[in-house]
Amino acid sequence: MILLKLYLTLAAILCQSRGTTSLDLDDLMTTNPEIQNEIINKHNDLRRTVDPPAKNTLKMSWDNTIAESAKRAALRCNQNEHTPVSGRTIGGVVCGENYFMSSNLRTWSFGIQSWFDERNYFKFGFGPTRAGVMVGHYTQVVWYKSYKMGCAINLCPNEPLKYFLVCQYCPGGNVVGR
């Protein structure tokens, strides 16, 4: 019995120390300037860690028009295909797009980090390190010419991965040969 109490106490402490808190969808809405700053700071922090170091990467900034476009994409709940180019062309500029889907609500930092972690399968100057791996999210996050972005989140209750995070980046990246 003493071991059970000790185990439960340790489990409670570990959950608290790992920052396990209940998230609410409203806590992650990108209309909140604090969330916008979290997203921008996470992107800029990760972009600074690119290896080899990039000399000409532009700093990301938030753009409300792009965020509205990302919101339209998130509201579609179409997790199988990206927004058509015509739906993510803003001011004549084609924007790139990343999706993150999850059955559990995750923070923006978690989703952005998951995109960035595709770097493990990418080699600069070569591309994907093996067939079938995803690296396009990573390359869009670090694309040197992208400097404006906006993101949105939506609950898609009829999807198995019901939480849908979308970021759009302008100008878009992933241009073959660059």
UniProtKB/Swiss-Prot annotation:
Blocks ryanodine receptors, and potassium channels. The keyword Signal applies. Contains 8 disulfide bonds. Keywords: Calcium channel impairing toxin, Disulfide bond, Ion channel impairing toxin, Neurotoxin, Potassium channel impairing toxin, Secreted, Signal, Toxin. GO terms for cellular component: extracellular region. Residues 41-169 form the SCP domain. This is Cysteine-rich venom protein VAR3. Belongs to the CRISP family. GO terms for molecular function: calcium channel regulator activity; potassium channel regulator activity; toxin activity. Expressed by the venom gland. It comes from the Eukaryota. Gene3D superfamilies: CAP. It comes from Varanus acanthurus (Ridge-tailed monitor). Disulfide bonds join C77-C156, C95-C170, C151-C167. Residues 1-22 form the signal peptide. It is found in: Secreted.
